[in-house]
């Protein structure tokens, strides 16, 4: 039986997206535009570009317009391949070259981030700071010297695993939950020594706990949800979240299907997960990592066909996670605009969050984490 909420979602996604786009022309009254304009706003996992663009497509005028409209200061952009030891090193090198070319071509809008000072400069100059990050350790293979290689190329965030097992540890869909390997321990030590941020977003529960314990500095979970609200493998338990916060880390809540156990999530689900994470971790340890593009989704038949094909491709490759479905989309229909962070701020304000707390969640917490880890 289809309840009214899911019927409205399934039949009205396009309408919701259009309504949100219309509302985007004016700032939400409950959180001042001036306050947002002064905030450091960080998407802990995302990137510029249009969702329906093919890989390696140069940024369009529309994508750059959306970057400026977003109000974002910086974004952790995935440059690594995932899930393939055969291909991911070469894929990562190509991705880094592509994004370096995009940053050079649009130096008035984009800035490569290597230090915390670069984030401050991005804010001052009203550009988007691009932080190169990994979502899998597969490009490293068994060669820890590659950490330095990729560091020289600008990478600043290293996620230990994707969903499956790799040489470092188990991802969140591995039934064995084997944790961090001996090689993984050495990898963590090398990342600490070289002052790179460790990300545990896709790690299995044991991998997450062991990596937090092993790291000498705070770590990130850049994009996840709360398992207490939606018990799916991609979400983190309260115990994991508290352990992260107790070591000084920050968790980013995503705008993904996993915010609900079933059905299409909305902004209300996102707010609930943020509220829960703040309750577990404290307001100094929560942020946002959308796991999506800055530009909104053009929700039409072509998008639905492409999305269904991507879900099937991920399943065939063995990298998908429970909760990924062709009819549950990887965006929130009522936050489908480039300035979604401003609307999230307004929703949190209506829930009673102070401007100071909202500013931390928008990006100040991740900015502080970057400064702590990168500067040592």
For each predicted feature, which ranges?
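N-terminal hydrophobic targeting/anchoring segments and the immediately downstream early-domain regions
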Residues: 2-21, 25-176, 231-376
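Divalent metal-binding pocket/active-site signature
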Residues: 138-141, 152-235
């Amino acid at each position: 039986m289809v309840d009214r909420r899911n019927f409205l979602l399934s039949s009205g996604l396009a309408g919701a997206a259009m309504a949100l786009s219309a509302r985007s022309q004016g700032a939400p009254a409950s959180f001042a535009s001036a306050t947002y304009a002064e905030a450091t706003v960080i998407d802990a996992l995302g990137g510029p570009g249009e969702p329906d663009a093919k890989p390696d497509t140069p940024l369009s005028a529309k994508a750059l317009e959306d970057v400026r409209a977003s109000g974002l200061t910086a974004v952790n952009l995935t440059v690594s391949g995932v899930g393939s030891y055969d291909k991911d090193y070469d894929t990562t090198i190509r991705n880094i070259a592509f994004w370096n070319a995009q940053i050079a071509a649009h130096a008035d809008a984009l800035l490569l981030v290597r230090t915390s000072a670069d984030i401050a400069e991005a804010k001052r100059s009203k550009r988007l700071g691009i932080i190169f990050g990994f979502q899998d350790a597969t490009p490293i293979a068994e060669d820890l010297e590659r950490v330095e290689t990729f560091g020289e190329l600008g990478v600043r965030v290293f996620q230990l695993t994707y969903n499956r097992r790799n040489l470092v540890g188990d991802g969140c869909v591995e039934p064995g939950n084997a944790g961090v390997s001996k090689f993984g321990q050495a990898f963590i030590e090398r990342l600490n020594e070289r002052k790179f941020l460790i990300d545990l977003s896709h790690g299995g529960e044991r991998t997450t706990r062991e990596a937090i314990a092993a790291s000498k500095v705070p770590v990130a979970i850049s994009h996840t949800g709360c398992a207490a609200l939606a018990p799916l493998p991609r979400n983190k338990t309260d115990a994991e979240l508290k352990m992260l916060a107790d070591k000084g880390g920050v968790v980013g809540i995503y705008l993904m299907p996993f915010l609900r156990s079933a059905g299409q999530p909305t902004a209300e689900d996102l707010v609930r997960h943020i509220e829960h994470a703040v309750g577990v971790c404290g307001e100094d340890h929560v942020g946002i990592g959308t796991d999506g593009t800055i530009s909104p989704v053009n929700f039409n038949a072509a998008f639905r066909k492409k999305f269904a094909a991507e879900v099937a491709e991920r399943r065939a490759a063995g990298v998908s996670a429970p909760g990924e479905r062709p009819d549950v989309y990887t965006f929130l229909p009522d936050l489908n605009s480039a300035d979604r962070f401003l609307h999230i701020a307004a929703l949190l304000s209506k829930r009673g969050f102070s401007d100071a707390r909202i500013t931390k969640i928008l990006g100040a917490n991740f900015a502080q984490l970057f400064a702590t880890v990168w500067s040592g």
